[in-house]
From Swiss-Prot:
Belongs to the 11S seed storage protein (globulins) family. Residues 118-129 have a biased composition (Low complexity). Keywords: Disulfide bond, Seed storage protein, Signal, Storage protein. It comes from the Eukaryota. One of its GO terms (molecular function) is nutrient reservoir activity. Hexamer; each subunit is composed of an acidic and a basic chain derived from a single precursor and linked by a disulfide bond. It holds the Pfam family Cupin_1. Gene3D superfamilies: Jelly Rolls (2.60.120.10). The gene is LEGJ. This is Legumin J. Residues 111-140, 185-235, 253-323 are annotated as: Disordered.
Length: 503
């Protein structure tokens, strides 16, 4: 009788302990958004590469823990190539400056871009085969780009100015089956760690977990030496031996050694001497004609090509709505939200707002992310509002202004000026208002953790509420209620009246 009773007691204690740990973990997760104050954040860490710069925000900031995201800002010099990488967290990228090309490697998709093959003998054809690869996409300033989790991608700057992009990694996304630690896996090169704070935590836990008794140290020391010989680089291929890679890819061992990149000091952004030669969806004769034209004409041509590509993607989207399913191989992954003609909300005196969500860019449905571009003219106001179903992250692109955020207790958790390069987290349902400065206005992009993020504006709520309710709720006279509901702009973009007009 005693043994079954003890077994049952042990099982009960184990289940109770597990439940307590789960409850504690859930409480900690939910408690991360109990923010008494919010700070404007700037990058905490930088990695300098041969042809660019990578900057990251510390993911341990309470604001970023609340939102469940991490951020990276990359600057790629002209002819700079950001090496192929992937992450378990889906990414949303906004192009702040410059233009370039981007390639993704979707598993199971064909290499639809091929070099034209000239007539030659079979022997010559075997020795020198034409290149082929998956689709290459152009992008430019103002584009929002969606990168699904686990999909390798590379970026190249073919412009004349630095390419600057801000990337959001949704570490709390359901697609990320690991923990909330931001991770970027590089296929090649010898990249430096982009989030050193989380690596230090992992190394500390690893040392604590692998503390061996004295009698077992000799064998473990030998294993560590063998591991160090293999892990000379920081790419995923660095962990495999050259011999194994040579066997796997059926190549020479010298090639396999280069794949491991053990002593490559160029880091994650490398310079391409002479420019990157890739297959474009145009004939060679047309390319030669373009090269013979002036620089300005070449830029006009590229803009026309981008517009044609946008139109083709729109047509494919319409075809999908008509019943022809869009495959992941040809899916539209980018949309420009900075063009004035693209504005969803517009006030000629206050500013404009554009939104990209799963309705305008269907791939965002799988990423569960969306974005908003806001440009406020001088003194323009984005009236008080809140995100109904998402956390949001406001990144200042240009200019300066003031942001005010209020929590559920009516406390002002943020009321400060913001400037170019700063990041402000706005938790779900926290009420926020933005106002541009007097000199150059305010331009910013907002990342949101829902593919169909909805916004509610205080002014809209007032107009949708019966006058008697407002009168009793705020102690207002009927004249004041009428003025509150009917005066001012219908939309959320407001240009304040001058002091003389307000009296």
């Amino acid at each position: 009788m005693s043994k079954p009773f003890l077994s049952l007691l042990s099982l009960s204690l184990l289940l109770f302990a597990s439940a307590c740990l789960a409850t504690s973990s859930e409480f900690d997760r939910l408690n991360q958004c109990q923010l008494d104050s919010i700070n404007a954040l700037e990058p905490d860490h930088r990695v300098e590469s041969e042809a660019g710069l990578t900057e990251t925000w510390n993911p341990n900031h309470p604001e970023l823990k609340c939102a469940g995201v991490s951020l990276i800002r990359r600057t790629i010099d002209p002819n700079g190539l950001h090496l192929p990488s992937f992450s378990p967290s889906p990414q949303l990228i906004f192009i702040i400056q410059g233009k370039g090309v981007l390639g993704l490697s979707f598993p199971g998709c064909p290499e639809t871009y091929e070099e034209p093959r000239s007539s030659q003998s079979r022997q010559e054809s075997r020795q020198q085969q034409g290149d082929s690869h998956q689709k290459v996409r152009r992008f430019r300033k103002g584009d929002i780009i969606a990168i699904p989790s686990g999909i390798p991608y590379w970026t190249y700057n073919h412009g004349d100015e630095p390419l600057v992009a801000i990337s959001l990694l949704d570490t709390s996304n359901i697609a990320n089956q690991l923990d909330s630690t931001p991770r970027v896996f590089y296929l090649g090169g010898n990249p430096e760690t982009e989030f050193p704070e989380t690596q230090e935590e992992q190394q500390g836990r690893h040392r604590q977990k692998h503390s061996y008794p004295v009698g077992r140290r000799s064998g473990h020391h030998q294993q560590e030496e063998e591991s160090e010989e293999q892990n000379e680089g920081n790419s995923v291929l660095s962990g495999f031996s050259s011999e194994f890679l040579a066997q796997t890819f059926n190549t020479e061992e010298d090639t396999a050694k280069r794949l491991r990149s053990p002593r490559d000091e160029r880091s994650q952004i490398v310079r391409v001497e002479g420019g990157l030669r890739i297959i474009k969806p145009k004939g060679k004769e047309e390319e030669e004609k373009e090269q013979s034209h002036s620089h300005s004409h070449r830029e006009e041509k590229e803009e026309e090509e981008e517009e044609e590509e946008d139109e083709e993607e729109k047509q494919r989207s319409e075809e999908r709505k008509n019943g022809l399913e869009e495959t992941i191989c040809s899916a539209k992954i980018r949309e420009n939200i900075a063009d004035a003609a693209r504005a969803d909300l517009y006030n000629p005196r206050a500013g404009r707002i554009s939104t990209a969500n799963s309705l305008t860019l269907p791939v965002l449905r799988y990423l569960r992310l969306s974005a908003e571009y806001v440009r406020l003219y001088r003194n323009g106001i984005y009236a008080p509002h809140w995100n109904i179903n998402a956390n949001s992250l406001l990144y200042v692109i240009r200019g300066e202004g003031r942001v005010r955020i209020v929590n559920c207790q009516g406390n002002t958790v943020f009321d400060n000026k913001v400037r170019k390069g700063q990041l402000v987290v706005v938790p779900q349902n926290f009420v926020v208002a933005e106002q541009a400065g007097e000199e150059e206005g305010l331009e910013y992009v907002v990342f949101k953790t829902n593919d169909r993020a909805a916004v509610s504006h205080v002014q809209q709520v007032f107009r949708a509420t019966p006058s008697e309710v407002l009168a009793n709720a705020f102690g207002l006279r009927q004249r004041q209620v009428t003025e509150l509901k009917l005066s001012g702009n219908r939309g959320p973009l407001v240009h304040p009246r001058s002091q003389s007009q307000s009296h």
